[in-house]
Amino acid sequence: MATENPNIVFIFPDQLRPDFLSCYGAEFIDTPNIDWIANNGVKYSRAYSAAPICVPARTSLLTGMNAIRNGVTDNQHFLRSDYRQIGIETLPEVL
């Protein structure tokens, strides 16, 4: 029997705060598609970031490693091209 992969959607917008989404109470904007995902999936009331800036935070989320360990400590660096060879796995690869 084949194993079915989970349906996981990560939305990685830059600088999007919950007060800019109608599913979190914003009244000046309608975000029906994100609202649908929030109402039919998982919606968080608290979030913590592994890094204070974008690229390291996203890389930490995808690798499960902090910025020092995965080597992405600022917005000018990205995950090494040989990350697989040095033993780093990303969430999509694990799933």
Show where each model-derived region lies.
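Formylglycine-dependent sulfatase
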Residues: 1-95
